From Swiss-Prot:
Its main location: secreted. The modification 4-hydroxyproline is found at P57, P65. Changing T59A: No loss of activity. Residues 1-22 form the signal peptide. The lineage of its organism: Eukaryota, Metazoa, Spiralia, Lophotrochozoa, Mollusca. Belongs to the conotoxin O1 superfamily. It comes from Conus purpurascens (Purple cone). This is Delta-conotoxin PVIA. GO terms for molecular function: sodium channel inhibitor activity; toxin activity. Changing F60A: Loss of biological activity. However, coinjection of this mutant protects against the wild-type conotoxin, suggesting that the mutant binds competitively to the wild-type conotoxin ligand site. GO terms for cellular component: extracellular region. The presence of a 'disulfide through disulfide knot' structurally defines this protein as a knottin.
Length: 81
């Protein structure tokens, strides 16, 4: 009997916790779907599509050598064209 009561209280607590910590219903999955669909139609609206501009040859490329337009960075400077 005690175990049954403990289980019922635990289930009720976990159910209440789920509802309390859940996202607002205004931002439910259906809204995420429509937002993603709109971003697919309008590529400029997509945050994933935005890339940083590449660095011109002779520019300091620092610790991110992948940002050189030529993809070739030696001793911190972009080379090539």
């Amino acid at each position: 009997m005690k175990l049954t009561c403990v289980m019922i209280v635990a289930v009720l607590f976990l159910t209440a916790w789920t509802f309390v910590t859940a996202d607002d219903s205004k931002n439910g999955l259906e809204n995420h779907f429509w937002k993603a669909r709109d971003e697919m139609k309008n590529r400029e609206a997509s945050k994933l599509d935005k890339k940083e501009a590449c660095y011109a040859p002779g520019t300091f490329c620092g610790i991110k050598p992948g940002l050189c337009c030529s993809e070739f960075c030696l001793p911190g400077v972009c080379f090539g064209g």
